[in-house]
């Protein structure tokens, strides 16, 4: 009908597809049980199939608008490039960095500069790139920028290959937990030894813009 549904899951949003009152195993964030009191939207497709949006913390949202207006929607038009796309490259960074006074951690998590990188992966990317999370973006050398771009793509592809990171809520489309949390280099490893060879530093935890940040006391001390 020339309309589009935009759905954001937030932190705890889940989609359940029911057929004859039974949850499909293909439900996104599939679980066998869910609390009906957290159902916020119900879409009836036919007499036997319904889609339910369930969200405990209510950080997500659903919007319906005309398809022709998708690119002008405020939630989409201000997004930065996909980090796995060709558009996220050295030339893009060279054009963007001079305008930015943020530290590297906040830059990676700011959706208007690069979309889709959350706290976990920002920590992992910065560590692999041996950059202090408090370092200002405009102080990065061209060599570090190239390394950062390379590691953004490397970490995200590795996380996808392992099914994501299931610390608490996240589940894959079939209800399975991800396994990338077993590969964490710094995230949630406060007090542990750095995994980089010949480093020996300890992982420290600080807060940057009220978000937990983990980094190595030696190889990221720059």
What is each of the regions a protein language model found here?
Residues 5-116, 121-128:
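Phosphate/anion-contacting hairpin/loop surfaces
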Residues 15, 92-222:
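Basic, nucleic-acid-binding surfaces and adjacent catalytic neighborhoods in DNA/RNA-processing proteins
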Residues 4, 49-50, 202, 212:
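Short, solvent-exposed loop/turn motifs
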Residues 1, 44-48, 196-198:
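Short acidic, glycine-rich loop/turn motifs
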């Amino acid at each position: 009908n020339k309309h589009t549904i935009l759905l954001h899951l937030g932190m705890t949003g889940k989609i359940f597809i029911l057929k004859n009152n039974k949850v499909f195993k293909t439900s996104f964030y599939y679980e066998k049980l869910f609390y009906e009191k957290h159902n916020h939207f119900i879409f009836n497709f036919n007499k036997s199939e319904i889609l339910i949006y369930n969200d405990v913390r209510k950080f997500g949202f659903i919007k319906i608008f005309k398809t022709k207006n998708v690119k002008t929607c405020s939630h989409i038009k201000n997004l930065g490039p996909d980090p796995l796309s060709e558009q996220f490259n050295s030339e893009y960074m060279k054009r963007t960095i001079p305008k930015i006074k943020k530290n590297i951690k906040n830059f990676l998590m700011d959706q208007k500069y690069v979309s889709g990188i959350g706290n976990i992966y920002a920590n992992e990317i910065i560590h692999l790139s041996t950059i202090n999370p408090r370092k200002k973006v405009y102080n990065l050398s061209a060599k570090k920028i190239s390394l950062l771009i390379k590691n953004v793509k490397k970490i995200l592809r590795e996380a996808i290959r392992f099914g994501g990171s299931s610390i608490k809520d996240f589940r894959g489309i079939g209800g399975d937990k991800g396994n990338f949390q077993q590969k964490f280099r710094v995230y949630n490893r406060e007090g542990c030894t750095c995994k980089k060879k010949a480093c020996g530093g300890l992982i420290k935890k600080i807060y940057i813009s009220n978000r937990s940040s983990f980094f190595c006391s030696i190889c990221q001390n720059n």
